[in-house]
């Protein structure tokens, strides 16, 4: 009878219990948000994904340039920073890492970088401690056509790309020969040019073990509206671009194209984590045009509120292998538009721009001012996210095997 009481108690209250941790993962990356470079953001996405799948995450990285920046701060990613004075002294670094791993005792280490920051020392420490050492490779769902256009990589900087590509990939994969504990880790079980080369090299080295880290995170939740009122945004449609200011994101080109259209009574909102010289050029290009707003250094809750309260989210990049902001919009049913680049054309719930021109942009924006169109696209995006990117869907599909 006592057993049945305990069983019933667990049955009724198990849904309120916190999820059981699957273990500890140490992510090692030489840059991590708030810095907005590709490796840093990809490491952030990976930390977010694994945390959503009930892993305890700890990040080992370099000191942040802006430690006070709250843009991407999350409580699930405690940080340990290694100063340059330590990482440049190999003997001291090895001693520190041995002690760190002994105290922290991660179940697995994921090294995330194309650089060799602390890699050899960490690999030795992992081998001595018997901790599996995973190497994170590139890879996400990709429409291969997007790679074979004159304004997209690899044709963008073709000579440099070819000269560096094979050596970089070989150097990374050579790490896997130094320990039987090594594995390759991929962001997604879909092919890219990078990943195909990795598979080819791994097969030649008889590396049979691969792990997949899918791109997943908890859905953005719609809360009571406050963002528009706080920042004085009118009732006009708001289209939001949550991306760092850079040439790769092409916000300047977007501004110039909008100015060549007849679009009116629309606010194009740029959420930029750090003001830089490119952002200053954006400010100059905008001038006193009321259609544009830039907000800097918003805390993460306000970034999420901006997305959920937007009529649409947009990007204008020429390369998007990990379109996190688009996936975030899909998770809460917000439509999007973006150029046909990288993984974007495989996603639903938005409008893919076949080319970057004022006329194409104007047509897409006008379509998204229609409420019925927005609702239809939003539902499509949400369905795809729930079926493929939501944490419970990822767990069901067993895409990750650590």
Give, region by region, the residue ranges found by the protein language model.
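Conserved donor-binding/catalytic core segment of Leloir-type glycosyltransferases
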Residues: 26, 221, 232-249, 255-258, ...
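Glycosyltransferase donor-sugar binding loop
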Residues: 62-65, 242, 267-281, 296
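A short, active-site helix/loop in glycosyltransferases that binds the activated sugar's phosphate group
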Residues: 161-208, 217-219
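Conserved short C-terminal alpha-helix that flanks the catalytic cleft of nucleotide-sugar-dependent
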Residues: 228, 368-374, 378-392
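Nucleotide-activated donor-binding/catalytic signature segment of Leloir-type glycosyltransferases, i.e.
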Residues: 280-301
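Aromatic "clamp/platform" in nucleotide-sugar-dependent glycosyltransferases that forms part
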Residues: 318
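Short hydrophobic beta-strand element within catalytic cores of glycosyltransferases
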Residues: 335-338
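Conserved small/polar residues in nucleotide/adenosyl-binding loops
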Residues: 400-402
């Amino acid at each position: 009878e006592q057993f049945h009481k305990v069983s019933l108690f667990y049955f009724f209250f198990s849904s309120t219990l916190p999820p059981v941790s699957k273990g500890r993962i140490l992510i090692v990356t030489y840059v991590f948000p708030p810095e907005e470079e590709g490796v840093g953001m990809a490491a952030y996405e990976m930390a977010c994904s694994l945390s959503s799948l009930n892993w305890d995450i700890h990040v080992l990285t370099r000191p942040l340039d802006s430690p006070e920046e709250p843009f991407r701060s999350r409580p699930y990613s405690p940080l340990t920073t290694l100063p340059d004075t330590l990482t440049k002294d190999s003997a001291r670094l090895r001693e520190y890492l041995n002690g760190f791993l002994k105290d922290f005792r991660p179940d697995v280490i994921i090294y995330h970088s194309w650089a060799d920051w602390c890699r050899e020392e960490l690999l030795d420490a992992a081998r001595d401690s018997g901790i599996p050492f995973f190497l994170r490779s590139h890879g996400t769902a990709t429409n291969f056509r997007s790679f074979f256009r004159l304004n997209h990589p690899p044709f963008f900087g073709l000579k440099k790309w070819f000269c560096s590509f094979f050596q970089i990939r070989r150097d990374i994969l050579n790490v896997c020969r130094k320990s039987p504990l090594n594995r390759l880790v991929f962001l997604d079980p879909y092919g890219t040019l990078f990943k195909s080369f990795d598979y080819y090299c791994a097969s030649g080295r008889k590396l049979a073990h691969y792990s997949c880290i899918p791109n997943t995170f908890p859905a953005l939740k719609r809360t009571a509206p406050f963002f528009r009122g706080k920042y004085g945004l009118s009732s006009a449609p708001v289209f939001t671009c949550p991306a760092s200011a850079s040439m790769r994101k092409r916000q300047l080109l977007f501004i110039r194209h909008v100015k060549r259209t007849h679009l009116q009574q629309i606010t194009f909102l740029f959420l930029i984590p750090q003001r830089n010289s490119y952002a200053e050029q954006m400010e100059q290009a905008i001038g006193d045009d009321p259609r544009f707003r830039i907000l800097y250094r918003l805390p993460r809750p306000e970034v999420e509120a901006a997305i959920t309260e937007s009529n649409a989210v947009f990007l204008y990049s020429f390369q998007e292998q990990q379109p996190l902001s688009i996936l975030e919009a899909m998770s809460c049913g917000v439509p999007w538009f973006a150029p046909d680049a990288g993984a974007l054309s495989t996603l639903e719930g938005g409008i893919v721009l076949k080319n970057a021109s004022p006329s194409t942009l104007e047509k897409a924006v006008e379509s998204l001012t229609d409420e019925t169109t927005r609702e239809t696209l939003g539902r499509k995006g949400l369905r795809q996210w729930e079926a493929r990117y939501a944490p419970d869907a990822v767990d069901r599909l067993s895409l990750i095997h650590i």
